[in-house]
Amino acid sequence: QIVRMIPTLKVNNRRLNELFYIETLGMKPLLEESAFLSLGDQSGIEKMVLEESPSMRSRKVEGTKKLARLIVKVENPSEIEALLARMDKIPQLYKGTKGYAFEVLSPEGDLVLIHAEDDIKDLKKVDETVTFSKDEKLQYLTAFDISVEINLPEETTSLLEKEEIENGLAFKQAQGSDLLVDNNVTWD
C-alpha cells in the first residue's frame, strides 16, 4: 500500500523554479541538499521535491510531457487570493463554491492548478478582471495537498491499482515520443 506520494520534478534551472514554487505558489522550502529542494507547507511535511538535472545529463522534453498537470489543493481558499494579489499579471482564473482558483505554467512548462474545491469539476472559468487585496502576513501556504495527472502513451494502462493511488494520481492517454523514455533522460 502506498502511504504517501511525493512528486519529484526534474528541472533544468532549480533557482528559477525555486522562485516560482516559493513566491508564486507559496510553497515553503524545507530542505536544500545538493541538487534537491524539498518543498512543503507550514506543517513542515514534505509535499514535493525539485531535482536539478543540468543539460549535460538531461534534456528538454520533445512533444508531450509525462506530467500533464500538477494539482495543488489548498486548505484555506483566502490564501489563493493572497497569492493572486502578489502577481503582476493574473493567470487563468476559475471560481468554485469555496473561492477562486488559478492555472499557471511553471518555468519548465508544467501546468499547475491551485484550488480549494472538493471536486475540480466545480470550477468555472472566470473571464472578467478581478482585483485581489494583498495579505502581507501570508508568506507560505498553511496547508495543501498535491496530486498529479500523468500522460500515458496511448494503448497503455497503469500497473497501479485504483485503491493504491486514491486521488493522488490520475492517468490520461496521450501521444508523444518522450512518454516512453527513462526518467533520467528528460526534465519531466
Per-range role (PLM):
Residues 8-47, 51-53, 150-182:
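Core segments of cupin and vicinal oxygen chelate
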Residues 88-149, 161-188:
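Vicinal oxygen chelate
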Residues 13-14, 75-79, 108, 154-155:
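Helix N-cap motif at beta-to-alpha junctions
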Residues 4-7, 27, 48, 67-68, ...:
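Short, structured motif recognition centered on aromatic/hydrophobic residues
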Residues 19-20, 78-85, 102:
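Short amphipathic alpha-helices within nucleic acid-binding modules
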Residues 71-72, 148-150:
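Short, well-ordered beta-strand elements within core beta-sheets of diverse protein domains
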Residues 1, 61-65, 138-143:
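Short, flexible turn/loop "capping" segments at secondary-structure junctions
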Residues 50-78:
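A broadly used, surface-exposed interaction patch
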